[in-house]
Amino acid sequence: MELKANVNFDRFEAALQVVDAHTEGEFCRMVIGGFPEPEGNTMIEKKKWMEKNYDNVRTALMFEPRGHHDMFGAFLCEPINKEADFGVMFMDTGGYLNMCGHCTIGAVTVAIEAGLVESHEGENEVVLDAPAGLIRTKAIVKDGKVESVTLTNVPAFVYKENQTVTIDGKEIKFTISFGGSFFALVDTTQLDIGEINAKSVPAYTALGMKMLDVINKEIPVKHPELDIDTVDLVEFYGPTPNKDKA
């Protein structure tokens, strides 16, 4: 038996057009239609407009039952910068992001394979207008399919070194850097949690969330050119186990 769907979307109160993709297993849900064009004179203003007026769309797409705890996605929209092929506003279960590497790769792949941007066999340059700035990418297309995407991120820099906060009575040192968002980078050798592995992830996650809260209360940050003034992520780094045996 051959089943053929005949869906009249006008019957529904709302309908979103999305394409689900992944980048090496990292999920990225691309929203390509069904939402109003965001208002704003910059991509950051567009992001804030969506956050204020249509955040229920983000939560509906990112949280269960349609999403999951580690869900990522993006709204594709008109760009502000005329150099760009399209605008992009990244999102996850926690809110909106100024930049996301794996979602950039996913967005370019979807845009090409869904016919949202013109493409040809071989190397294609696709430029995205994101809240963090222009993201330039190169996509290799073979037989109409995207084989690979490389990207050049926005300018990255170290913002503040030798910063400290006190968490549960212990002073923790870290560096704040920018790479599309502000990151707090923490050397794990100063901690008592141990090497980074599956067993220690819950402890690092709990500490990271505590640090994120305290950092944004105690340490002001401001991008020199963009309206970005919060630390969005805490990242832990440490020695590679058994690196001499690799």
PLM features: residue spans?
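Active-site proximal loop and beta-alpha junction motif in alpha/beta enzyme cores
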Residues: 2-99, 106-246
